[in-house]
Regions:
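Membrane-interface anchor segments at the N-terminal boundary of transmembrane helices
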Residues: 52-55, 161, 165, 401-501
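Loop-to-helix entry region of an early transmembrane alpha helix in multi-pass inner-membrane enzymes
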Residues: 57-59, 143, 147, 155-176
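Extracytoplasmic catalytic/substrate-binding loops of multi-pass membrane glycan-assembly enzymes
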Residues: 115-128, 136-152, 157-161
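Short acidic/glycine- and proline-prone juxtamembrane loop motifs at membrane-interface regions
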Residues: 122, 210-220
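Transmembrane-helix motifs of polytopic, lipid-linked glycan transferases
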Residues: 165-188, 227
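Membrane-interface alpha helices of multi-pass inner-membrane proteins
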Residues: 243-257, 269, 286-293
Length: 545
């Protein structure tokens, strides 16, 4: 009996520590949000702000939000145990699948008709313009888009139809993945009302539909990621997984975005450790991916003569930290200046430093990527040596750059880069006089709604407003909900479910380390689409006996 009392006491202490960990993390994020939000709102004039992160008001905000977060996790954990989300009634799984597939395809079809033949951005148009044009985009994504588009264009001589067919194929793939997810949670015994809520969330969330009719690598990555999550859950829990889905999802995640491999390798290693019966399949799959990746890297070196932009793309945080040190007149030695200004002239560092956005620096015409690629070690040593003397500036620059990933404040829609957050046309982030706009004009590819003009004007106005409302569900809020669920799962000892959430944390970690911007919503599409999975499976598993 005494041992049981000790175990109960130890368990209560563990629970309180988990609750406090979540509470303090929310409090600290809230304090930083309170101090930095004025800067984010006025990002054009952010340099004139002198931010003091830790002061009396900031600590008060931290304390209040920590208390509120503690109450939140306590109430949610208790309420989740008292609400039954399981059902003993078997579902007609085929009915769930096909009804979802048909309804979702129909709704996306209406959206496509409204913005026919679909939307995109300059990265998309680059893929149409030539076969494997640059090293910025994943090679596989470029080659697939180019091959399908040019093949259909060659046969029908109509660029609009060719583009629309690719988007329609994307819609069908997305509808299959969503229908497969709802069939999967039905198989797990989720109550009908919660199943319907999942369906409503996915089908009614404006930006989910917006990205589904946009030809973006982020769309491919996110839907493949969403296809993979239920299968990871099944593998970790020793249940039957669908291996053809795993293979397809893993290949798309790996080759559709540069951080795909960084997400998959740790996950596959963990699955190899915990899923003994599947080790052979996992080993073959990982080896195949590595071999294909090596082959593509070799082909890239041959095609582009060794020119590679991958190192520059991974240096977003160091670049903004070094730029901030220049702008705020930090302590920089002559040797450090030599490396720094060989990459980019001093006046360009000062001119191009921006809040939460590194592209003006790395895409400046004076940026010497060849020097950077040839002097990686010297550049990293310079960055590290500057950090020792300018730590305060480095921390401030890091918080500025990653603000959109963790901030608890609702987006000021004027501060968001809408050209890469809400997609309304083919060349969404460029003008008609740009090289991308001119290319679209040369092949007569343009947006033209299939609906009547009056209806088009009405629906587009409403839909665009709805997309802006959707921006209020920020990456920071979604990450807070992920942390809330993870802590509740941890407290209830559902460690296998915690492992299932790991890919989401790896994606977020990549954004915090190497993302070029944090006020671009498309980078967080994976969180938006995966959120119902996280909430539903947390609710189900902590009450599952």
């Amino acid at each position: 009996m005494l041992r049981n009392i000790k175990n109960i006491g130890r368990r209560n202490i563990e629970c309180q520590l988990i609750y406090l960990l979540f509470s303090f993390s929310v409090g600290i994020a809230g304090m930083c949000t309170y101090q930095l939000n004025p800067v984010a709102v006025d990002k054009g004039g952010f340099l004139r702000y002198d931010i003091d992160l830790v002061n009396e008001r900031g600590l008060l905000v931290c304390a209040i939000l920590s208390i509120m977060a503690y109450l939140l996790i306590t109430v949610v954990d208790k309420g989740a145990h008292q609400t039954n989300v399981a059902t003993m009634k078997p579902y007609n799984e085929n009915r769930v699948f096909w009804s979802t597939f048909i309804i979702y395809s129909f709704l996306l079809g209406i959206l496509l008709a409204l913005y026919f033949p679909g939307t995109g951005m300059n990265d998309t148009i680059n893929c149409l313009m030539g076969f494997w044009q640059n090293t910025l985009q994943p090679a596989m994504f470029q080659m697939i888009i180019y091959g399908i588009f040019q093949g259909i264009f060659f046969m029908c001589k109509n660029a609009t139809i060719a583009y629309a067919i690719i988007v329609i194929l994307q819609i069908f793939a997305a509808s299959y993945i969503v229908a497969n997810y709802l069939r999967w949670i039905a198989r797990k015994g989720i109550a009908k009302w919660l199943l319907i809520l999942n369906m409503i969330y996915i089908m009614a969330m404006p930006l989910i539909g917006n990205y589904t009719i946009a030809l973006l690598k982020d769309t491919w990555f996110t839907y493949a990621f969403f296809l993979l999550l239920p299968n990871i859950y099944d593998l970790i829990h020793g249940e039957k997984a669908c291996w053809w889905q795993i293979v397809v999802a893993v290949f798309v995640v790996w080759f559709s975005r540069s951080n795909g491999k960084l997400v998959l390798v740790p996950i596959m290693v963990l699955l190899f450790i915990f899923c003994k019966s599947q080790r052979k399949h996992l080993a073959i799959l990982l080896i195949t991916l590595v071999v294909l990746n090596s082959g593509l890297d070799y082909a890239k070196n041959v095609r582009f003569g060794g020119y590679d932009e991958s190192f520059r793309e991974s240096m977003s945080v160091p670049l903004v930290q070094m730029a901030a040190t220049v702008v705020w007149n930090g302590n920089i030695s002559e040797d450090e200046e030599e490396v720094l200004y060989a990459v980019l002239p001093e006046e360009k560092w000062r001119q191009n430093y921006a809040f939460a956005f590194v592209d003006p620096i790395k895409f400046d015409e004076h940026f010497d990527n060849l020097y950077l690629a040839a002097h990686k070690k010297e550049f990293l040593q310079t960055w590290a040596s500057m950090s020792k003397k300018n730590l305060t500036i480095y921390v401030k620059a890091y918080l500025y750059h990653t603000y959109g990933n963790w901030s608890l404040a609702a987006y000021n829609t004027n501060a968001v880069d809408k050209t890469q957050s809400i997609f309304l046309k083919l060349n969404n982030n460029t003008g008609d006089t740009s090289i991308w706009g001119e290319y679209l004009a040369s092949i007569s590819l343009k947006n033209d709604s299939l609906l009547p003009n009056d209806m088009t004007e009405l629906l587009q106005g409403f839909y665009e407003d709805a997309c802006e409302w959707n921006l209020w569900l920020t990456p920071g809020i979604m990450f807070l909900l992920l942390n809330l669920c993870t802590c509740i799962v941890w407290k209830n000892k559902r460690y296998k479910l915690m492992l299932t959430f790991l890919p989401l944390y790896l994606c977020w970690g990549c954004m915090m380390i190497a993302s070029p911007a944090s006020m671009i919503y498309r980078y967080s599409f994976y969180l938006l689409l995966s959120l119902p999975f996280v909430l539903t499976m947390t609710w189900r598993d902590i009450g599952y006996k």
